[in-house]
């Protein structure tokens, strides 16, 4: 079976080669004058020569068991490409030739077939070697193409990376320049700050030294001031003791002398300086003359008199105000007395009517007047009054009218006492205001006398005069240090019956 297959394959190869030879020699499909069914000789030498030249276009043999698939696919593709090149007319002529040559090939001998088989095997081996070489070349070319592609891709990537690298290098250079500039600025600022810090440290040390020196000087000065204050306090105490030992006139003279000695012409007022400067006749040494001094002293006296006149006007106004206050108080008191008198008359009428009605009622019930077992209205009022001799004079003062009159007198006395208290408080307030203004003026003129606001406590005792009214004969008002207003009823209208005890303000009321 293998021999038959080999012979059939060899015959197919021979037929294919004859067809190719016909194509090369110029046969256009007419069979070169041959008829179908005829027997013709085949030249194997010429065919073998063409095979050796490498121009065999025979179709590929059947694949053996040991052949590779890539070789078969390569041969098949080559054969298919060659077959596609022939025209359709040549294919029909080839089929006719094959049918005519089958009979002629069957008559060949076995030896010739073996020789042909050996030759074909050799050619197949040569073709295998050539195929392997061409495959190696193809593989090498593919690898070279891959390498070239990778190199092209790498070239593109490297160009991009080179551009990016150049940009990064430029950025790095610019950043390095900026960093160098910033470092230089930092070093410059650091040096400048060091210099400033050193200068401030020197200033701080110098100020600390000066502060220490000033503290020491301040301590010394404070000690000196304390010593001077203590000496001044002692001298002021001695001065006050000496003034207390003198009379009022001597005290005034001493105060005037002290003011003149302290002030002199160095502490003269603006008016005195103006008068002294207006003088044209200058004495020896540029001092003002006696006439200028006299004019300055007269100006000063004139100002003092003006101040005293203002004080007198104020006191006059106060006197008018006090007189008006007394007048208003007495008018109010008279109005109250009139109202109380009207009320008393009405009460008397009502009391008389009530007594008559009660007596008539008792007479109607019992036929005789009832004894007075209870206290009367006047006795009850007297019992409410806390007096020592009220129990002794209970029988004499049994009528309620007398008791009411006594109560009215007491109320009037209280009202008068309150009015006097108001006046005295007003007077004391004005006196204190005057003293405050005088002390402020003295402080402005003589600032050394700050510790002595009351140098002359007996100066304004004459301002408080004895006050009198038609009812009260003695009203005593003391000085501003302690004032007690006492009111005694030594002279009272004889028409009114009063108690024997004295009605006065309590001793606890002190202004």
Swiss-Prot record:
Modified residues annotated as Phosphoserine in this record: 504
Subcellular location: Cytoplasm
Regions of compositional bias (Polar residues) in chain numbering: 1-12, 83-108
Coiled-coil segments on the chain, per record: 105-243, 293-325
Entry keyword Membrane: no
Main location as per UniProt: cytoplasm
Keyword set, alphabetical order: Coiled coil, Cytoplasm, Phosphoprotein
GO term, biological process aspect, one: negative regulation of cell motility
Location of region: Disordered: 1-110
GO MF entry, a single one: identical protein binding
Residue spans of biased composition, Basic and acidic residues class: 43-54
InterPro entries: CCDC125
One term under GO cellular component: cytoplasm
Functional note: May be involved in the regulation of cell migration.
Protein name: Coiled-coil domain-containing protein 125
Native source organism of the sequence: Homo sapiens (Human)
Gene label: CCDC125
């Amino acid at each position: 079976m293998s021999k038959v297959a080999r012979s059939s394959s060899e015959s197919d190869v021979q037929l294919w080669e004859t067809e190719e030879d016909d194509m090369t020699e110029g046969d256009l499909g007419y069979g070169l004058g041959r008829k179908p069914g005829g027997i013709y000789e085949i030249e194997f030498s010429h065919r073998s020569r063409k095979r050796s030249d490498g121009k065999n276009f025979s179709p590929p043999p059947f694949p053996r068991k040991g052949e590779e698939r890539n070789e078969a696919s390569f041969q098949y593709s080559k054969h298919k490409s060659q077959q596609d090149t022939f025209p359709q007319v040549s294919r029909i002529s080839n089929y006719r030739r094959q049918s005519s040559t089958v009979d002629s090939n069957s008559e060949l001998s076995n030896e010739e077939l073996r020789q042909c088989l050996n030759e074909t095997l050799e050619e197949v081996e040569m073709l295998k070697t050539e195929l392997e070489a061409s495959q190696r070349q193809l593989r090498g070319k593919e690898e070279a193409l891959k390498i070239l592609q990778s190199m092209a891709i790498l070239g593109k990537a490297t160009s991009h990376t080179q551009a990016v690298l150049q940009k990064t290098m430029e950025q790095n250079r610019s950043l390095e320049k900026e960093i160098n500039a910033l470092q230089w600025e930092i070093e410059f600022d650091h040096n400048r700050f060091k210099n400033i810090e050193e200068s401030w440290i020197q200033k701080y040390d110098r100020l600390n030294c000066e502060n220490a020196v000033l503290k020491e000087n301040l301590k010394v000065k404070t000690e000196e001031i304390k010593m001077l204050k203590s000496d001044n306090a002692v001298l002021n105490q001695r001065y006050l003791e000496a003034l207390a030992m003198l009379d009022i006139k001597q005290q005034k003279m001493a105060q005037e002398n002290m003011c003149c000695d302290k002030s002199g012409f160095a502490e003269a007022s603006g008016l005195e300086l103006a008068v002294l400067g207006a003088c044209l006749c200058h004495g020896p040494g540029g001092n003002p003359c006696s006439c200028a001094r006299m004019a300055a002293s007269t100006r000063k006296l004139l100002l003092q008199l003006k101040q005293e006149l203002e004080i007198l006007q104020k006191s006059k106004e106060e006197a008018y105000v006090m007189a008006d206050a007394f007048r208003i108080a007495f008018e109010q008191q008279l109005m109250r007395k009139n109202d109380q008198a009207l009320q008393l008359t009405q009460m008397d009428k009502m009391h008389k009517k009530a007594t008559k009605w009660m007596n008539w009622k008792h007479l109607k019930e019992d036929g005789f007047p009832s004894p007075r077992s209870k206290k009367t209205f006047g006795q009850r009022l007297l019992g409410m009054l806390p007096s020592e001799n009220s129990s002794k004079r209970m029988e004499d003062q049994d009528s309620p009218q007398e008791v009411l009159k006594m109560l009215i007198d007491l109320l009037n006395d209280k009202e008068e006492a309150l009015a006097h208290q108001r006046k005295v408080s007003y007077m004391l307030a004005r006196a204190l205001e005057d003293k405050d203004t005088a002390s402020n003026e003295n402080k402005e003129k003589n600032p050394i006398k700050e510790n002595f606001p009351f140098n002359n406590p007996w100066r304004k005792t004459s301002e408080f005069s004895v006050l009198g009214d038609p009812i009260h004969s003695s009203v005593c008002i003391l000085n501003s240090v302690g004032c007690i207003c006492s009111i005694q009823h030594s002279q009272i209208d004889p028409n009114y019956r009063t108690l024997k005890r004295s009605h006065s303000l309590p001793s606890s009321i002190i202004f």
